[in-house]
């Protein structure tokens, strides 16, 4: 199911306020982030040695990553009993490759992140900001206890943010939803993309409008990828969108979904601008603009990824924004990652809250990514035009 809601004027704020519990800048001084979160000067952290990084990419708050601890790090902090979502901040300080620093993270006696390779997790980049959120950590003895265990080289940590779960604001008013409770896809809201393989991201699948790939049954939308020879491809799948039919500027967007698993799968719940040429400088009005090498509509006009999941890292959910100023080719992509249980076995709610001031992304109301409007130009914030839903499963490609 999917839903879109708007915040009623004068009824509060969509900002992720009120969920803050404790935050520290490891090895560094106190700092207030662009979204207003106050990180304290390091406390409650022992062991390891303090280091520094001169230049950081991929974050609106690079100061948080300029200091870090390396070694057998421990965190022991008094905190009220309860359930917390913990965001760990990392940046690889050394020019090393994938597999050259690997460690585990433990909280309250249990392993919460296994085989954490900062370079691998950050798209094989060093000196780039990485956040990993672990939800539902239960503290029952009045103290939060975290420690790190090395597998290869020494663990590192740049900052730590501890949150309580906040309820969804009652100020949202539902403006559109699709529960997929009919017998077929509602074509007044949805359209298919029918594409050959390799059109974007070097993906292996052909997108079709066949019911084998996209259908509504038993009260659910089903998007299904198949290994088969079809139209020059070795796989088929489905991709649908609401462009020109259900376009939205700001609001809360929710999708309840169960994801496919397996190496090579790359499902996504995401949004593109409904007028992709708003900030394009090299093209205008090209109907087939996606994957067009001479058109800079992407990344100029933006992209919001509410959920991406790649099969080789099951249960790792990614939320991302793409802009001209900050995208992957420049090592400056702004993104967050959360680890959940049963992404391919259970339904979870993937959500976006989007206002003129900021973008926040959630899974099951666990807040794990924020991007703030810096008040500069369209290059940093193209998110002032209507966007539309896209649902798809890619196969293979540059990431899958």
Located regions from the model:
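Generic structural microfeature
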Residues: 6, 19-21, 83, 100, ...
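Compositionally biased, intrinsically disordered or flexible polar/acidic segments
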Residues: 15-168
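GH16 jelly-roll
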Residues: 167-400
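Sec-dependent signal peptide recognition
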Residues: 1-5
């Amino acid at each position: 199911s999917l839903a879109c809601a708007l915040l009623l004027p004068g009824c509060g704020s969509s900002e992720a306020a009120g969920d803050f519990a404790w935050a520290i800048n490891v090895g560094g001084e106190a700092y207030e982030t662009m979204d207003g979160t106050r990180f304290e000067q390091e406390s409650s952290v022992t062991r390891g040695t303090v280091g520094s990084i001169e230049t950081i990419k991929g974050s609106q708050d690079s100061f948080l990553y300029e200091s870090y601890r390396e070694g057998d790090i421990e965190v022991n902090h008094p905190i009220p009993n309860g359930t917390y979502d913990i965001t760990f901040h990392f940046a690889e300080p050394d020019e090393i490759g994938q597999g050259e620093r690997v460690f585990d993270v433990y909280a309250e006696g249990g392993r919460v992140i296994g085989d954490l390779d900062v370079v691998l997790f950050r798209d094989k980049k060093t000196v780039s900001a990485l956040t990993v959120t672990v939800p539902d950590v239960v503290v029952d003895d009045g103290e939060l206890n975290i420690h790190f265990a090395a597998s290869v080289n020494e663990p590192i940590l740049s900052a730590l943010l501890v949150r309580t779960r906040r309820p969804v604001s009652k100020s949202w008013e539902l403006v559109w939803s699709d529960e997929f409770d009919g017998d077929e896809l509602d074509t007044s809201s949805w359209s298919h993309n029918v594409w050959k393989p390799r059109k974007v991201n070097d993906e292996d699948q052909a997108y079709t409008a066949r019911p084998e790939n996209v259908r509504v049954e038993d009260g659910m939308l089903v998007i299904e990828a198949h290994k088969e020879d079809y139209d020059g491809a070795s796989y088929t799948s489905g991709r649908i969108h609401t462009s020109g039919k259900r376009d939205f500027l700001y609001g809360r967007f929710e999708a309840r979904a169960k994801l496919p698993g397996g190496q090579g799968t790359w499902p996504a719940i995401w949004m593109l601008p409904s007028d992709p040429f708003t900030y394009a400088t090299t093209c205008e009005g090209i109907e087939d603009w996606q994957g067009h090498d001479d058109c800079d509509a992407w990344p100029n006009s933006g992209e919001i990824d509410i959920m991406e999941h790649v099969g080789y890292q099951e249960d790792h959910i990614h939320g991302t924004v793409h802009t001209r100023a900050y995208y992957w080719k420049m090592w400056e992509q702004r993104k967050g990652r959360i680890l959940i249980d049963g992404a391919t076995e259970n339904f979870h709610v993937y959500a976006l809250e989007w206002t003129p001031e900021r973008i926040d992304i959630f899974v099951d109301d666990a807040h794990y990514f924020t991007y703030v409007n810096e008040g500069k130009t369209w290059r940093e914030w193209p998110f002032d035009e209507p966007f539309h839903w896209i649902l798809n499963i890619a196969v293979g490609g540059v990431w899958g």
